[in-house]
Amino acid sequence: DDHDFDEEIREIFVEEAEEVMEAINEYFPKWAANFEDTASLLEFRRGFHTLKGSGRMVGAKVVGELAWAFESMLNKVRDKVLAPDQVMVNLISECLSVIPGLVEDFAGRQPPRINTSPLMAAADAVCRGDVLTTLDVAKAAEQAHAGPAAEADETAAAEAAFDALAASLAPVATAPSAEPA
């Protein structure tokens, strides 16, 4: 039965995610305290890689895409394209703080309670070489924790503004043009 298979895969993913988070939580603080600790960097980066792959495979897209954004950033640190700093540590910490809730939401077949877009955008900005501040990371975290509802409110506000603009332009668009005599 497909339902039983789906449940089994879901349970395996949740167990694996918990194990991966344990490893990340072991190695990330070591690296955060000493950026020269390449072995720890590689270990916790592998955790993001695993979450990306297994999340995508089982349909935990939000977890997979968030993990991919951070794995990409960590790949650049590993390859010495990006120099780590305390802002990056803060950003990774914020990411790690939301993953367990996202996994829990997936396990319970609930929509994600976290809007991961601001955290992914911050990681992408770092990958592009943008300089983020601690305040930028705090804002991204605040927006993430505001949840998908805040994103929906912003979308609704933008749609309402567009509708109002379109309505104000409609009379201009439909007015008969004066033909020269």
Describe the predicted segments one by one.
Residues 1-181:
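Non-catalytic helical tethers at domain boundaries
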